[in-house]
Amino acid sequence: MIFNPVISNHKLSHYIHVFCTFTTFCILGTETRQAITALSTYTPAFVTAPTVLWSNCSSCMLMGIMQSLNAYTWMKDHQVLFLGVTTGYCGALSSFSSMLLEMFEHSTNLTNGNIANHTKLPNRAYGIMEFLSVLLVHLMVSMGSLIFGRQLGKEVIVAYGSSSFSKPYTPPSDTVKENAGDVDTQEMEKNILEFKFKTPAPFFKKFFDIVDKLAYALAFPLIILFVVLCAYYENYSRGKWTLPCLFGIFAGFLRYWLAEMFNKTNKKFPLGTFLANVFATLLIGIFTMVQRGKKHFSTDVPIVNSLNSCHIVSALISGFCGTLSTISTFINEGYKLSFINMLIYYTVSIAISYCLLVITLGSYAWTRGLTNPIC
């Protein structure tokens, strides 16, 4: 069953709606991830910073809530909004490539803090424990957040926010598809067969309408705003707050296109999301090598040794790579697969991505060495 929105009889109007809404949520998701990372970076922190753990947790919880709302047909009149929040916002808020980079840096003792303080593991075998620590904490927190979000949406929001039962609902058959990995059509069909269609209370309908219209209207103003800010301010904000959001737009659409093109090829292995995550991890390894790799073995000067270039590389790492890869869709897809297929999907994705980091960033770190970036 293909689940698509009914926005307008004119396809151009619909595509503009999708483009604007998706763009807005990609910008907001990238900016939120940057803000949460900055907020969670302090000393002494229980969760060692910098990390995308908080962002991944938040995005998976929101993804779970949206899955429940959509499964009970709450989003039947707002499918473009659903696409924007799940694939756009949650996808940009979470980051698979950043998680893999954390995993690599901790397991190889190459974090910025360890290099600056000359911190060493008791022996190299402890790298295995560091690898498992990052992997298990991220995956378990993300999966737990998704399950909690789904139950919160089902048992609280849908249960207490529905005004009445609605008539049986037949989804339209054009545009936004399940292939993006964020539409659970099986659960939706099950609820339809069991006559579990619910109508959200007027407050929620109005809220969805307002958010949908705001997302539609804010796309181009936000693009113009960030372009102007990026051009005017040449300080650290260019690499941390402005450029990442602009790069995130292109990354978000690339991820969505890959999912639309390739996820339908194999229902047991979401190939589109896999390609997006692996490609983003390869790029983040290369960009990190350029930003932190020593120019010469005998000096601590990095390859990128100008402040402006360093900010641009930082924006590519957090904006393009961070948004191109996603944990929320990755976890949600695994949740919908059988347990064995989920293990295969997760293992192959993580193993290949980690090996790419070893080949790119690791080989340079162990021959020339890494240093801290200048920005």
Swiss-Prot record:
| Residue ranges annotated as Cytoplasmic topological domain | 1-11, 56-79, 149-213, 263-268, 332-338
Any one GO MF annotation of this record: fluoride transmembrane transporter activity
| Alphabetized UniProt keyword annotations | Cell membrane, Glycoprotein, Membrane, Transmembrane, Transmembrane helix
Give the knockout phenotype.
Answer: Highly sensible to fluoride, but not to other halide salts. The growth of a double deletion of both FEX1 and FEX2 is inhibited at almost a 1000-fold lower fluoride concentration than in the wild-type. Has increased intracellular fluoride concentrations.
Q: Which Pfam families does the record match to this protein?
A: CRCB
**What intrachain disulfides are recorded?**
none
> Which locations, inside or outside the cell, does it occupy?
Cell membrane
Q: Show the InterPro entries listed in the entry.
A: FluC (IPR003691)
Q: Which reaction does it catalyse?
A: fluoride(in) = fluoride(out)
GO CC term (a single one): plasma membrane
Intervals, Extracellular compartment = 33-34, 101-127, 235-241, 290-310, 360-375
Q: What kind of membrane protein is this, topologically?
A: Multi-pass membrane protein
Q: What positions does the record give for glycosylation?
A: N109, N117, N235
GO BP annotations, alphabetical order: fluoride transmembrane transport
Which residues span the membrane? Answer: 12-32, 35-55, 80-100, 128-148, 214-234, 242-262, 269-289, 311-331, 339-359
**PANTHER family given for it?**
FLUORIDE EXPORT PROTEIN 1-RELATED (PTHR28259:SF1)
**Family to which this protein belongs:** Belongs to the fluoride channel Fluc/FEX (TC 1.A.43) family.
Function, as annotated, reads: Fluoride channel required for the rapid expulsion of cytoplasmic fluoride.
Give the free-text miscellaneous remark of the entry: Present with 220 molecules/cell in the plasma membrane.
Q: What protein name applies here? A: Fluoride export protein 1
* Originating gene: FEX1
